[in-house]
Amino acid sequence: MKMIDDVIIIGIDSGYGNIKTANCCFPASVSTYAKEPVFKENLLVFESKFYLIGEGHKEFLADKTRDLDYYVLALAAIARELNIRKMTCGKIRIAAGLPLTWVSGQRDEFRDYLLQNKAVDFSFRNVSYHVEIVGVDVFPQGFAAVADRLSDFRGVNMICDIGNGTMNIMFINDKKPVSGNMFTEKYGTHQCLLAVRENVMRAHHTAVDETIINRVFRFGTADIKEDYLKTITDTATDYVEGIFQRLREHEYNPELMRLYVLGGGSCLIRNFGVYEASRVTINDDICATAKGYEYLAYVNLLKNGGIV
């Protein structure tokens, strides 16, 4: 997080699989209870309701304002960032984002959603917090992660941000983003996970735990029998081939441009992709986009004379 005067800027990358801030990452899932649950390691209490953060699985919602989940997850993200600085209160400016082609249509609604309470009292992990939400900025995903290094993007560059639910594609040509050449595809890593489950069930007549699948995605292997591993890696390889097919449909040509891959799915490109390494850059910092949101909000405030 960054600070201007007494205002704390906290970047929150509200993904469909994980919530990321500049310093932490946790599952984007919430279970709600009317009474205090037995297990409460990641318990958040807000307006007399109990929320277990990281429990269950959050379904894909193109409209993140449809329920209260992403608001509660934002409170958890704020608490985790404040905890790093040993703080429990403060003025907060949220720097958030949406998929590239959804920003213009959903920005105002998402901003109002995160601003629904100016003063917020809640507790997380048995620590009480009092925060004042003084503003919300909403930026485009993908671009935010590279906004602080545009000078590195000479020539033609394709940016590919692979998240859990979506894949965002844009171009940066001679250090400038091309606003009319941006795309959002519902082809995130969750689609690969579903394909793995289906193929393992078809080939081996058994279910495979998501923990194993994610480990193979991240490291290319896991402590399982070879025939199961082959089914998973073959499926992941097919998924990555699908990514490159979609990139080519959007004019990707490795001979004429460089490719910059980021997001949680970047590990799949590294482990299962076939590409010319000298022309592809993989940024596997899962918090890069949240850091970018903070950077953009900070720069905007400085341009505005520090006025929040």
Identify the meaning behind each predicted range.
Residues R197-A203:
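Acidic, metal/cofactor-coordinating or nucleic-acid-engaging core segments within structured domains
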Residues I169-D174:
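PRPP/pyrophosphate-binding module of the type I phosphoribosyltransferase fold
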Residues I162-N168:
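Ser/Thr-glycine-rich phosphate-binding loops at phosphate-binding pockets of nucleotides
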Residues M1-I159, K176-Q191, A203, T211-V308:
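Nucleotide/phosphate-binding catalytic cleft detector across ATP-hydrolyzing
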